[in-house]
Amino acid sequence: MTIKRKKVSVIGAGFTGATTAFLLAQKELADVVLVDIPQLENPTKGKALDMLEASPVQGFDANIIGTSDYADTADSDVVVITAGIARKPGMSRDDLVATNSKIMKSITRDIAKHSPNAIILVLTNPVDAMTYSVFKEAGFPKERVIGQSGVLDTARFRTFISQELNLSVKDITGFVLGGHGDDMVPLVRYSYAGGIPLETLIPKERLEAIVERTRKGGGEIVGLLGNGSAYYAPAASLVEMTEAILKDQRRVLPAIAYLEGEYGYSDLYLGVPVILGGNGIEKIIELELLADEKEALDRSVESVRNVMKVLV
């Protein structure tokens, strides 16, 4: 009897895509197909071969190939989209949204053709709007098109709390709701250190500073790098979500999900807590929010909807 190996395709072989592919292979979660445009096929093949040649040293058994041919992605269990352009000097936000939306639609058509049963994870920014664009183009059930930002934003939140308290990140739990931007909503009230509410451990003004740093977390990395944006933490976040799906772990994680009345919103993708498993989003978890938390989430939703107006 032949056992079918899991297969994950990563679209976009830049820093984030390549790092995601390598981490997936290192963890032996699946065989990996790294995809980029035809003009970058040789560099993509080179990166994949370089990763594969690390397998004897790292001790992992996973096949990795680079390609520009979507036929090589056929029958993927999960497809991760990291492709897209970054905002360039002189480019408006609307231009970025319109351009990346066109890229998403083209990629999605190829995914749907070759892997009609796949679960799609979207990272490309602005991620809430891009996930919506992929969903509309794919025609997949909503639970199989998911955006990634909450795991990353929550990881940043947990990191800063860990540093503040000088405690292991393993003991820090938290949630960040809303869109992936300055209006995201880190939920202090649902965040703990070893089961102890943060509000009993960290002064209010320090918590507010941590929340603000979390909101600006991506920009902080961009400013320090000088060129480009974060990729290690985004890649690790994608891998955590992919693992939850491939292993049907039913993890409670923040993810960008399609809402149909949850939290009082409909027809948009927004970061909320979900149960993530073998079918994708198994359930959206609705938290009880205080008035100020709901107001903050409303502002975040307004920002997401403003971006979505530009979708083509």
Swiss-Prot record:
It catalyses: (S)-malate + NAD(+) = oxaloacetate + NADH + H(+). GO terms for molecular function: L-lactate dehydrogenase activity; L-malate dehydrogenase (NAD+) activity. It is an enzyme of class 1 (oxidoreductase). HAMAP family: Malate_dehydrog_3. It comes from Bacillus mycoides (strain KBAB4). Its EC number is 1.1.1.37. The modification Phosphoserine is found at S149. The keyword Iron does not apply. Belongs to the LDH/MDH superfamily. MDH type 3 family. This is Malate dehydrogenase. GO terms for biological process: lactate metabolic process; tricarboxylic acid cycle.
